[in-house]
Amino acid sequence: GILDFAKTVVGGIRNALGI
């Protein structure tokens, strides 16, 4: 659902920032 999508987006952003 929307919340799962949001979690995925946030996880991707955090992953990118953690390079």
Swiss-Prot record:
GO cellular component, one term: extracellular region
One Pfam family matching this protein: Antimicrobial20
Keywords in alphabetical order: Amphibian defense peptide, Antibiotic, Antimicrobial, Secreted
Compartmental location: Secreted
Single Gene Ontology BP annotation: defense response to bacterium
Tissue: Expressed by the skin dorsal glands.
Superkingdom to which the source organism belongs: Eukaryota
Principal localisation: secreted
Role played: Shows a weak antibacterial activity against B.cereus, E.coli, L.mesenteriodes, L.innocua, M.luteus, P.haemolytica, S.aureus and S.uberis.
Protein name: Uperin-2.4
Organism: Uperoleia inundata (Floodplain toadlet)
